[in-house]
Amino acid sequence: MSLTQSKEVNSLSRRYSTYIERRITRTVMVGDIAIGSDYPVRVQSMINEDTMDVDNSYLAIKRLHEVGCEIVRLTVPSLAHAKAVGDIKEKLIKNNIDTPLVADVHHNGMKIAMEVAKHVDKVRINPGLFVFEKSDPTRTEYTDTEFETIKKTILKRFTPLVEVLKSENKALRIGVNHGSLSERMLFTYGDTPLGMTESAMEFVKICDELDFHNIIISMKASRAPVMLAAYRMIADRLDAEGYNYPLHLGVTEAGDGDYGRIKSTAGIGTLLAEGLGDTIRVSLTEAPEKEIPVCYSILQSLGLRKTMVEYISCPSCGRTLFNLEEVVDKVRKATSHLTGLDIAIMGCIVNGPGEMADADYGYVGKGKGTIALYRRKEEIKRVPEDEGVDALIRLIKDDGKWIDP
């Protein structure tokens, strides 16, 4: 077999694999949370409160912590806000909440970033807003000299922050947004994934020059196709140039309700399935704590993390022998705390036993008024329908897998 044929076979084997092979990335510590391909994909969010409101900011972080959020971001638009973050951090420590904090800094926020770096575990900057570039409607080109001049300005302003982050072993997110590319990136590359990639790479290379590698990169857009293209492009570019930095995935401004969740899943889930992504945020126009179950559901659906019971149930049809929706609800209410189990509830024997073969336990209609309970592929017993849920619980208890809620 030739080298080319071997590569094609390997590519096909990955394409048809039932296991997601993650892109190899370095480990970046954000507080005590390790981000990178050697660790689970992490879940994070951002609070809505004004950071100056220390008490309510603390409570918002506490709510996120309680639902499993691993990293929390705060907006820091001024020096006063930066100092308030210190008070928030102190209150978290006093209450034994160790969730790492990320400061979101924009618009020439060098002094702000320097101040807040003392109090947080990671600073997020937006390359498009780091150095103000005044729009010139008469411009016909950006010369190499102009690019180099602006790069030197960025280097001068950026270096002190990098040195602080290095000295305190803290992290940086280079957070590119499709909607806020710099004037010269827009002029040169357009409002495109390529413009986003060039924007990110400019800062990646500056960090490399400064020997700073605690970097995470994001390429967010409000349209999933743009976001998908940008993340694929930056991953290819990083790998081609020998950089193995982790990626933070997200569809920004995804909206709310079902559509916001579906839109986020279309973007984030697609990239995760391709092996890209080391930490994720689902951005909803809702209370931040509502984002966290969506994140964990995406990860569990792809087999990347298991943090809840996996329920397998058919959509129901004319062959269904009991009220499937009602029974699924009863089983879920009784067993949702048994993290790690797979439980299948199937309406009839046509597809039931085969479809649920990988489940730990099965609940299948076997005739009018009769339920069959399974342990993996083995039928254990048949019981009257009205005793089915209780009998399932007894079976789980008999196997020593029950935990009181």
From Swiss-Prot:
Function: Converts 2C-methyl-D-erythritol 2,4-cyclodiphosphate (ME-2,4cPP) into 1-hydroxy-2-methyl-2-(E)-butenyl 4-diphosphate.
InterPro entries cross-referenced by the UniProt entry: Dihydropteroate_synth-like_sf, IspG_bac, IspG_bac-typ, NO2/SO3_Rdtase_4Fe4S_sf
Reactions listed under catalytic activity: (2E)-4-hydroxy-3-methylbut-2-enyl diphosphate + 2 oxidized [2Fe-2S]-[ferredoxin] + H2O = 2-C-methyl-D-erythritol 2,4-cyclic diphosphate + 2 reduced [2Fe-2S]-[ferredoxin] + H(+)
Domain of life, source organism: Bacteria
Record keywords, A-Z: 4Fe-4S, Iron, Iron-sulfur, Isoprene biosynthesis, Metal-binding, Oxidoreductase
MF terms (GO), sorted A to Z: 4 iron, 4 sulfur cluster binding; 4-hydroxy-3-methylbut-2-en-1-yl diphosphate synthase activity (ferredoxin); iron ion binding
Amino acids binding [4Fe-4S] cluster: C314, C317, C348, E355
Enzyme Commission number: 1.17.7.1
Signal peptide: none
Pathways per UniProt: Isoprenoid biosynthesis; isopentenyl diphosphate biosynthesis via DXP pathway; isopentenyl diphosphate from 1-deoxy-D-xylulose 5-phosphate: step 5/6
Cofactor list: [4Fe-4S] cluster
Organism in which the protein naturally occurs: Prochlorococcus marinus subsp. pastoris (strain CCMP1986 / NIES-2087 / MED4)
Annotated GO biological process: isopentenyl diphosphate biosynthetic process, methylerythritol 4-phosphate pathway; terpenoid biosynthetic process
Free-text remark on how the cofactor is bound: Binds 1 [4Fe-4S] cluster.
Iron-sulfur recorded as keyword: yes
Protein name listed in UniProt: 4-hydroxy-3-methylbut-2-en-1-yl diphosphate synthase (ferredoxin)
